[in-house]
Amino acid sequence: MRINPTTSGPGVSTLEERNLGRITQIIGPVLDVAFPPGKMPNIYNSLVVKGRDTVGQQINVTCEVQQLLGNNRIRAVAMSATDGLMRGMEVIDTGAPLSVPVGGSTLGRIFNVLGEPVDNLGPVDTCTTSPIHRSAPAFIQLDTKFSIFETGIKVVDLLAPYRRGGKIGLFGGAGVGKTVLIMELINNIAKAHGGVSVSGGVGERTREGNDLYMEMKESGVINEQNIAESKVALVYGQMNEPPGARMRVGLTALTMAEYFRDVNEQDVLLFIDNISRFVQAGSEVSALLGRMPSAVGYQPTLSTEMGSLQERITSTKEGSITSIQAVYVPADDLTDPAPATTFAHLDATTVLSRGLAAKGIYPAVDPLGSTSTMLQPRIVGEKHYETAQRVKQTSQRYKELQDIIAILGLDELSEEDRLTVARARKIERFLSQPFFVAEVFTGSPGKYVGLAETIRGFQLILSGELDGLPEQAFYLVGNIDEATAKAMNLEVESKLKK
């Protein structure tokens, strides 16, 4: 831990005594800087450019060293806009990597990539900071206990349960509901979760960051009256930020979460929305750094960059980090290098389907595409495992029959297949659920469904006890009792119409 040399406070006065260089080239967010012989900064060192632009405005840009070019020159990536910078400007080497505030005083606050508060609530009351670049915990320190993390979302808890202290990915293309699902998980887990949470907004909409902040305040997760009692720290590097900020803001959020795990020995929730923007930001600066592009134009260091971030998100004997990450899937292609590289690091994958979203089934989670390492009889129990497998088998059979139904119609199916299709359609609708965070859009109050209730509901559908109920009774309800009540209401309504 050290005093942060890149933010305002007692560390800044020492900057003037540091190593000085001069800008020799500026290409967008990438700067080339020349230093005196024998005074080259290290890779990942933080550099600060101070001065005035042509109209006299104060400039204060922080950069990170990426390459040593030879001839006493380095190449660095800026963490903020490079507008107004000129060749010949003085650059100060801080002599240390970018460091951000950590600890209890970060809770209830919003930070940028540099660890500077951006919520107009004054400076952060801490002198404890931590560098954003660290090595992952040693293998011997890791924790290997298996336990389920209940989310209250039926499709997730039944078919792809989340591991406490694991890494979870929400995969989906544009506009299928990743952010709504991650906000619902924050709502269901962070409120009920006794520990602390860190939320990293990486290259997403500023509006969504603002909505999340307002919702946290309304729910009491952020306590406005006594900020020290808050349960979450927010770190934002939104899509209007330069690629340097989007490339490093995930590490800033992770560094804050690691402190709670390692020093405070707490169980931490880490939400990252969206991990693909971290990859895209790296791709943006990769060519400017002179690297040859790899597959589909991505940076050749894609696997290394992803691995260095993901391997730090883990559970140790001191505490755990349970991370939930949204993963944007370009053009709905799961074989794209960005989602494909992310897959390898995850314990559970929740895949969102555009086909289900088009049908109006939300959350649009694909029951056959979503997977979890936790769905084993010895971990979840025989009853849960058996129910999940039967739901998947029924859904798979329905998928196989859809072409026949489209060409010949339902009447050409065997009696057994017709029954399978009817139950599969009920299952498909029962996997939908009204969300708390979507109440303003749907007008339906949100529902939290416990795991035992979820298993009971699907067992009743599979057993045939509810074959007589109309399939629309299962759409957007909580537990199975609500579905039977809705069926009775539909029956009463139809009688009144007659």
Swiss-Prot record:
Enumerate the Gene Ontology biological process terms.
proton motive force-driven mitochondrial ATP synthesis
Q: Which residues bind ATP?
A: G172, G173, A174, G175, V176, G177, K178, T179
- Report the locations given in the UniProt record: Plastid, Chloroplast thylakoid membrane
Repeat as a keyword of this entry, yes or no, is no
What are the annotated disulfide bridges? none
Name of the protein this chain belongs to: ATP synthase subunit beta, chloroplastic
Stated role: Produces ATP from ADP in the presence of a proton gradient across the membrane. The catalytic sites are hosted primarily by the beta subunits.
Q: Which Pfam families match?
A: ATP-synt_ab, ATP-synt_ab_N, ATP-synt_VA_C
